[in-house]
Amino acid sequence: MLAGTRLLAQSPVVEVPLEFHDGHGLFAPGYGGVNWERGPNDNDWYKTYQPVKGIPASWKDVKKGNIWIDAHQFAYQNYRAGLLQADVYQGLKEGWKIDTTQLSPKPIRCFVYVVTGTTSDGKQGVLVDTNHDLDFTDERVVYPPTMLSIWKTGPLQEAIVSLPADFYRGGQVVTYPVKVLFALSDGNVLYNYPTYASASIRSGAKPSR
């Protein structure tokens, strides 16, 4: 075992360029749930909610919430803004192992607001605040397919929304495009990021150091 460890330690590091693709590739996709807003009772996140506008008046059973693109950054910036209690944040910091040296001290676009409801034609629609202005008036209605249909046919482009998001890298805030795929499971709106990477290396190629 020790000999194998020494050999591994002496092996050169191989750097392989990645190529990113839309979809899930050969991987089984996982999904997350939207953080829907709820009342103030026993709700540590209540003060982090922001008012939005532009929700169609004809929609019924409307729910409003957000997706945390970077949950660590979201918790940290709301704590610094006084919108998340210190004891709650400290618990998250320990449980999530939040490293504040890797996070922006100023608020950035690390989340996105989402609303869902029953449209006038009886379908379940989703609106995403892709330009982060808290106004859904100019947003495209997405009709999420069921997870079963996605498993059979793959991600549907009309169920994918693209938006800019901010990240803290190397002491600077950088912006990257993020794609979000929405799906329905028993009426619940779920999402994931339909992007995967591939790499290839020629047999006998010399690794870079």
Where are these regions (language model features)?
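Sec/Tat signal peptide C-region and signal peptidase I cleavage site
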Residues: 5-9
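Calcium-binding acidic motifs and repeat modules
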Residues: 10-209
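Sec-dependent N-terminal signal peptides
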Residues: 1-3
